[in-house]
């Protein structure tokens, strides 16, 4: 029998009160909570939950991700493994599930609904998951929900395969996550009426308010790529009485150097610091994801699993101890989640490229280019005079217009897709990556074809990774697992990433806060407005490839 007691100020989120208590834990469960007469320094509360994250974007395998985030009081995540599914299919999903089971940390996976993000007609991924694949996944007790349905056209037009995937979740009483950025109210209503119940893509408060009025649960996102907290946090007080049950917090995509400094606890601290109701904020961070996704995570009630955190500071929420299933997984600066190494899996069929492969020409007077936005995954479409790129159609550094290319890594000798992008800011050199949402082909951007070719070939040689270079220096972070993840510990991969990011900004000249993260979303054709994938420039608004 494993029996112990905790004495601390008990934060009762449900009844909105705090009082000193003695809490008894037996065999991983809360068996009693008793008020006591004492003056105590520590506070105890349920653990934090990230309500939507792609663990692969941290470059960490699930066990090493868990090792990192327990120090911030995170006890569970709602995780969509669609990044690795695009590369390795169901084998990739099983890799994530099996690795996650080697720790106490609670990761609740969904069945990816859109692999690839739209369909194989629009882009090339390493695998395709059809409705039968999804239905088989939904049968598993390891799958808790249907992951974000990004093919909004398929939902609105009632595409049979898309609707079948949604119904495979609903018929099993599992929830369906949404992904609906920039839709009109009319189309939003059609999209949500299919049975989809959440959205984490709101970037304006007006969009979020409308979706809340439809009964949609809004997940406020503050990650490494998209940062929407500043725009959406007023909802917390607006929704205090009417919609408090309808909000959650998430990181979505987060790099390890960001998570080193904080996770959901950092969002909680900001929200409380902005004056929002203390208990409402904690309800959003600790309670709402458990109730919505119906996951077995304790809420610090009698009979619950003993998943809780202890802190002395309820302003910053710096965590002193984290418990999961009654086991101490973090204390006094030390994570007790083991670091685990795995045999890599991958999917790479791409041979060395030549400079001639990156040549581009057009007879069009005006051509569309991508206009990227700092700290956002949406872009704008800009039309420019093609003479700005004449005569050789490389980059125009003076106008900050750079060549961008996608190289199919799954089907060798495919034609390279080429476009142009503004606001990236590189002055001399190139950066590249196999983290290229969501199909994860090779994406490169640079100031001339020679740099583009060199960056591409370094990535091909290593079968995946992140790369930045100029004439003097080349930096590569190897990502041997699907070209997405490393088996290195979080601190080591975070240090490598910080060095790479500093090189991109301070040496290559990019003005973006996180150039590689921004680059990775320039191929995501389900987020407005203009993106590029292995088949060409895609106008998300008109839902078609552009002739340029």
Curated annotation (Swiss-Prot):
Belongs to the metallo-dependent hydrolases superfamily. Adenine deaminase family. This is Adenine deaminase. Its EC number is 3.5.4.2. Keywords: Hydrolase, Manganese, Plasmid. Pfam families: Adenine_deam_C, Amidohydro_1. It catalyses: adenine + H2O + H(+) = hypoxanthine + NH4(+). Gene3D superfamilies: Metal-dependent hydrolases, Urease, subunit C, domain 1. It comes from the Bacteria. The keyword Transmembrane helix does not apply. GO terms for biological process: adenine catabolic process. InterPro entries: Adenine_deam (IPR006679), Adenine_deam_C (IPR026912), Amidohydro-rel (IPR006680), Metal-dep_hydrolase_composite (IPR011059), Metal_Hydrolase (IPR032466). Its cofactor is Mn(2+). CDD domains: AdeC (cd01295). It is an enzyme of class 3 (hydrolase). GO terms for molecular function: adenine deaminase activity.
